[in-house]
């Protein structure tokens, strides 16, 4: 994990933005002179054009979301933004929670975090552009591989369409990797939206309904221990003294310390 310190002042500023709401996240920096590798899954043959997307050999479209789902529907919302411009149905994406990286900074906080109803307004244009640029590279690669003009091609839910033929995005990954974006691809006008602003199902609904969704409480790593905070019975009270002997004598207790 790549972490750096964030000042108390900066944390308070970020907290103020949320209007007293919860901020969950990590502080990261863009000041390092050494590029930090993207914290994405290493899959043979996969194309990772940016920090948010991967296209796998089987044409799985993997989206890394850098905002925490806390019931507010942000996973569906952010996948919808990138899916709109990439021309991939969000329900067909493999969506994963992103790791820590400077590319995932919430610009409203100056650090990687979720809160203050900021996810959509902070990343609306960014993720749409991510999708549009990736689609643009795929179309350019397809044009080269098929020997046709890019204007003769269209896309449809993860496929490049040429006449009556359909080719998966993954078919053009090898060529796309050699291309670069000189100018941002144009974004769709609102009149052409298929997913943004439309009624849709939640991308995580089935996982939650079947109990397969993973949350923080589900994390289990070797030699992991659990901590419990014993709070004062009244607000603002502070412990005058702590006798931890009895607690430490209980089975399973490793340590007791004051906060």
Where are these regions (language model features)?
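Cofactor-binding beta-sheet edge motifs in enzyme active sites
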Residues: 2-28, 32-259
């Amino acid at each position: 994990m790549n972490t750096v310190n964030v000042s108390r002042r900066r944390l308070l500023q970020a907290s103020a933005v949320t209007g007293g709401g919860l901020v969950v996240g990590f502080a990261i920096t863009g000041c390092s002179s050494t590029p930090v590798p993207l914290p994405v899954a290493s899959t043979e043959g996969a194309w990772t054009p940016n920090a948010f997307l991967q296209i796998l050999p089987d044409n799985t479209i993997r989206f890394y979301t850098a905002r925490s789902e806390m019931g507010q529907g942000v996973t569906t919302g952010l996948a919808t933004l990138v899916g709109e411009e990439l021309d991939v149905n969000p329900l067909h994406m493999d969506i994963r929670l992103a790791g820590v990286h400077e590319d995932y900074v919430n610009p409203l906080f100056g650090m990687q975090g979720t809160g203050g109803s900021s996810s959509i307004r902070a990343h609306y244009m960014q993720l749409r552009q991510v999708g549009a640029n990736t689609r643009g590279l795929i179309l350019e690669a397809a044009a080269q591989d098929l020997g046709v003009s890019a204007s003769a091609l269209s896309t449809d839910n993860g496929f490049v369409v040429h006449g009556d033929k359909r080719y998966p995005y993954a078919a053009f990954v090898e060529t796309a990797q050699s291309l670069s974006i000189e100018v941002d691809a144009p974004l769709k006008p609102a009149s052409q939206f298929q997913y943004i602003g439309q009624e849709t199902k939640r991308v995580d609904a089935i996982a939650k309904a079947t109990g397969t969704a993973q949350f923080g409480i589900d994390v289990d790593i070797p030699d992991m221990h659990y901590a419990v905070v014993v709070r004062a019975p009244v607000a603002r009270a502070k412990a005058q003294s702590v006798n931890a002997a009895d607690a430490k004598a209980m089975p399973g207790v490793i340590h007791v310390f004051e906060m």
